């Protein structure tokens, strides 16, 4: 399992973000504003008014970490400053903080996936919803870094920018079909990691090779390395066949185009709800630069799905990200990054066994517990 320590000072990394304001006009240090926002989000605050309210209630506590010489910034100041903070600089500070905090072990899965912030859409101002592409450490459920794109279709250009920010030495980087690109595969290898990429119709040559090499009957009765799982949950039964192979003749020419390609894999899923007619099988194809066993393919694919279950779900249900209607300037992106920091802290505190929402409420009520979260 990856080692996670958030002890290296968040305030130190936030203080590196340059302040865009004229020095003689500054009443509240930028690092104080950012730290206040993180703490308020940890405790469940959702908008600028609630963040200001939190600050007034916890000012003595906040002064243990920052200056706050002028007290608490107003909600108008918070909104204005967070809309104008350089999002790229804040992004860099976040990534550097996580590099200082987070050590990965050989073979650890880092899942890269995107999420649209639905609340950032503003029809009246002609602003489309922004899309955040995040790198997620599957072992302990924390975000390692993220970049913004204007829309989901831009993930192809966003992923290379995200990879530049990360320490991936020895990791297995999993990306869905949007990121199944030759340049991205090469960049992952250049970072000292291996790739596991989902293949769909956007790579027709690969998809055709899989269909030719692995018809359904061959997958179910595969004579090579295979791993089968059978799960029952609330009346639903799902059986998954996982197979892996070295590069076969169908992929021989393609292997010269995909740097480092060593393993091809297939996951076929059969699902049935109660006594209903079984659903049509779902087939997913994968290419990897790692020497994967069928069991490792199953584990890595499952860990990639944690992005939906452990990250996106937590952001939407616990931190109510999609309900947030803030979209002025760069505020939506900056506040999304504050949520990621807050969620990392909440995930990192493991002594209290409650869920994210319960941890937030406990932190809001108990300053000692909030201090424990910040000291993880």
Where do the protein language model's features map onto the residues?
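Dynamic "connector" segments at or just before major functional cores
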Residues: 1-112, 119-120, 134-146, 160, ...
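Short acidic (Asp/Glu) and glycine-rich catalytic loops that position anionic groups and cofactors
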Residues: 15, 278-282, 292-295, 314-322
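Structural motif
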Residues: 23-33, 276-278, 326-334
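Conserved active-site and cofactor/substrate-binding residues in soluble primary-metabolism enzymes
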Residues: 31, 46, 154, 333-336
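Short, conserved catalytic/metal-binding motifs centered on acidic residues
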Residues: 36, 51, 74, 111-115, ...
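Polybasic low-complexity intrinsically disordered regions
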Residues: 100-174, 180-193, 200
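An anionic, glycine-rich sequence signature occurring as long contiguous blocks
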Residues: 200-303
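Basic, amphipathic alpha-helical segments enriched in Lys/Arg and hydrophobic/aromatic residues
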Residues: 300-376
């Amino acid at each position: 399992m990856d080692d996670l320590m958030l002890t290296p000072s968040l305030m130190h990394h936030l203080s590196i973000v340059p302040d865009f304001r004229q020095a003689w006009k500054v009443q509240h240090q930028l690092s104080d504003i950012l730290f206040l926002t993180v703490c308020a989000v940890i405790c469940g605050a959702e908008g600028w008014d609630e963040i200001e309210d939190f600050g007034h209630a916890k000012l003595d506590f906040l002064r243990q970490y920052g200056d706050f010489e002028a007290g608490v910034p107003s909600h108008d100041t918070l909104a204005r400053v967070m809309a104008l903070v350089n999002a790229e600089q804040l992004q860099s500070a976040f990534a550097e903080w996580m590099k200082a905090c987070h050590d990965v072990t050989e073979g650890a899965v880092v899942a890269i996936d995107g999420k649209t912030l639905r609340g950032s859409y503003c029809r009246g101002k002609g602003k489309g919803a922004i899309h955040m592409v995040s790198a997620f450490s599957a072992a302990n459920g924390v975000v390692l870094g993220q970049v913004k794109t204007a829309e989901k279709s831009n993930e192809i250009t966003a992923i290379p920018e995200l990879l530049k920010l990360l320490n991936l030495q020895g990791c297995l980087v999993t990306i869905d079909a949007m990121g199944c690109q030759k340049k991205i595969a090469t960049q992952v290898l250049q970072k000292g990691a291996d790739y596991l990429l989902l293949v769909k119709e956007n790579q027709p040559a690969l998809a055709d090779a899989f269909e030719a090499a692995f018809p359904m009957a061959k997958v179910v009765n595969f004579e090579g390395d295979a791993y089968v799982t059978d799960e029952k949950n609330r009346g639903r039964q799902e059986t998954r066949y996982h197979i892996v192979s070295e590069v076969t003749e169908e992929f021989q020419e393609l292997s010269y185009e995909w740097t480092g390609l060593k393993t091809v894999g297939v996951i076929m899923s059969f699902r049935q709800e109660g006594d209903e007619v079984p659903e049509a099988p779902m087939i997913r194809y994968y290419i990897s630069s790692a020497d994967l066993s069928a069991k490792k393919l199953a584990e890595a694919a499952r860990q990639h799905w944690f992005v939906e279950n452990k990250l996106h779900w937590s952001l939407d249900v616990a931190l109510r990200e999609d309900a947030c209607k803030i979209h002025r300037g760069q505020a939506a992106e900056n506040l999304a990054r504050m949520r990621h920091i807050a969620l990392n802290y909440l995930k990192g505190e493991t002594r209290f066994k409650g869920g994210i929402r319960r941890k937030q409420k406990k932190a809001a009520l108990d300053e000692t517990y909030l201090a424990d979260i910040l000291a993880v």
